[in-house]
Amino acid sequence: MTYEEALAWLYARRRTGERGTHRVRALLARLGHPEAGFLAVHVLGTNGKGSVVAYLEAAFRAAGLAYGAYTSPHLVDFRERIRTHLGPVPREAVVRFVAWAREEAWEEPPGFFDLATALAFLHFRERGVALAAVEAGVGGEKDATNALSRVALTVLTNVGEDHLEALGGTLEAVAR
């Protein structure tokens, strides 16, 4: 399988059924819980999440940490989403992960963001990441990034009124 074929398969994955973290949690369990291997700074909000992750990434780099960063969406190449102190996730790692995921039998097939999140956490474990900055995707309690098990800090950027209903209804509920 080529990198381009792996990406085509990933992009074709659509979430089916009810939103929630159960699919990504099942996926992470099959991978031996890579999310347990690093501390995370979970970045949530409507705007500015990518900037906060970039600032954190720069701070981690300056401190000489073995770090990871997970953001979305990417601008040019999927590998921009998943980075460590050693660079972006290699094409070969993406192909290897997709080949594995395609062969697995799933009760509820994981969607694109579930798969991308699991790949990021797996890659962080493989690269010996100690601390990762992780940007939430769709946000709210059903976001795949909520499968993180060792959150050291949560950063909440601004929350737009257009997202309040989906995230809890009020700013107070979102903050909880």
What are these regions (language model features)?
Residues G17, T21, R25-A36, R61-S149, ...:
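ATP-dependent carboxylate-amine ligase catalytic core
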Residues E5, Y55, L119:
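Short Gly/charged-rich anion-binding patches and loops
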Residues M1-G17:
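Charged, amphipathic alpha-helical linker segments immediately N-terminal to NTP-binding catalytic cores
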Residues L7-Y11, R30-L39, L56:
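Non-catalytic interaction surface on structured domains
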Residues A6, G20-V24, L39, V52:
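Short N-terminal amphipathic alpha-helix/helix-capping patch enriched in small hydrophobics
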